[in-house]
């Protein structure tokens, strides 16, 4: 079966243990989570989990159905990359001497459309928002200049098409 990348959005109340129950669904099916992030949704007290997996369409459909059976889950959806607008954020901590001694590093930062967010005598921090390929490319380019730390967020995304979640969340808000 052909594996594709899917973004699963789970709208939920923020209750203890739900993350564990959701991750167990993937564990039982031997599906690795490529990315996971969570945040407040557009409705107060409703949270959104964004989960990225590589699997086939039938398996992701079944996973979403299983997630929706969980208590505390309001609704879950899945989308392909073509159906979403998505980004990741990355931070790079680099030796300060590189910034002042290596002209090339300034060119790399400028060409990648990254931003220097802080500078200290020992290090500076660069922030880059983009696709995983973009943040990974910058990581590889910075490595020879003394990359001290690197961290990348999970995917954040919105759908291109209107989702029916707005009405569901509004109904949820009015009932609680």
Residue ranges and their predicted role:
Residues 1-47, 52-176:
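Long, contiguous binding/interaction regions
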């Amino acid at each position: 079966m052909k594996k594709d990348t899917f973004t699963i959005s789970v709208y939920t109340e923020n209750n203890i243990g739900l993350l564990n129950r959701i991750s167990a669904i993937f564990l039982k099916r031997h599906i690795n989570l490529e990315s996971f992030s969570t945040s407040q949704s557009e409705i107060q007290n409703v949270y959104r989990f964004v989960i990225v997996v590589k699997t086939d369409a039938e398996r992701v459909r079944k996973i979403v159905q299983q997630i929706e059976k969980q208590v505390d889950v309001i609704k879950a959806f899945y989308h392909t990359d073509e159906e979403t607008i998505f980004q990741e954020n990355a931070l790079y901590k680099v030796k300060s001497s590189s910034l002042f001694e290596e002209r090339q590093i300034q060119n790399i930062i400028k060409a990648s459309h990254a931003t220097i967010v802080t500078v200290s005598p020992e290090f500076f921090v660069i922030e880059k928002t983009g696709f995983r390929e973009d943040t990974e490319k910058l990581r590889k380019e910075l490595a020879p200049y003394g990359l001290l730390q690197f961290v990348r967020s999970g995917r954040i995304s919105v759908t291109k098409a209107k989702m029916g979640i707005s009405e569901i969340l509004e109904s949820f808000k009015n009932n609680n």
